[in-house]
Amino acid sequence: MKKALLIACSLFLCLASQPVQAQKPHSDLHNEIGVGAGPFSFFGGFIIGTADFFGALGNSLSHRAYSSNYYGLYDVHYYYQINHWCQVGVKFTVEGSRTTIYTDTLRTAVSSINRDLIFTLMPSVRFTYFNRPWVRLYAGADLGVGYLFSHTQDYAKDDPESKGSNFFPAFNVTAFGVNVGKRFYGLFELNAGFDSFVKFGIGARW
């Protein structure tokens, strides 16, 4: 009776451990590096968009035309696999815009050009809740520092060039992320913070 009970317990433990073992990634693929791109981040886009909005309002009141071009957001990231469900790493992002202001509504000549760039450097953690050799689903959080750089060329002034910069706390939450691939993979993420709210990317593991 005791022997049968011991065998039954051993069988149960083996069966229970199968999903966990199946979720563990390959032990030799601890490092991950990748790049990503998207249209803009919620907070970075808000900072730049607010500046563009008030600039556009002032230009409208002054009867001057303007045009804005957004560069998009780009990132480079590195992660180290601690165990089958947790990764730690660091993420660097950059996004920006260029606004051209004209002397009149007919765009006869350029009055000024404004450029805004936002850089962030954020330590990051990922939590993988579905881990298979070819597919990983995860969520994550980032917290670090950001830097806003503004450059204006005003052709109507004697001193046409002006610059400004500010540091600020940067953060991000990855609500949903998916990696598809083993040593080389593609990714898709939904973010809220200073990473692109929709992001696509590629990467490699070793």
Q: What role is predicted for each listed range?
A:
Residues 39-41, 69-152, 178-180, 184, ...:
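Gram-negative (and chloroplast) outer-membrane scaffold detector with strong preference
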Residues 45-53, 100-108, 149-159, 198-203:
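Outer-membrane beta-barrel translocator domains and adjoining extracellular loop/strand segments
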Residues 181-194:
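Transmembrane beta-strand segments that form the barrel wall of outer-membrane beta-barrel proteins
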Residues 21-80, 203-205:
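Short glycine/proline- and aromatic-enriched beta-strand/turn motifs that initiate or cap beta-hairpins
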Residues 1-30:
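Cleavable N-terminal export/targeting peptides
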Residues 142-172:
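Glycine-rich phosphate-binding "P-loop"
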Residues 60-64, 106-113, 157-164, 185-187:
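Extracellular loop and loop/strand-boundary signature of outer-membrane beta-barrel proteins
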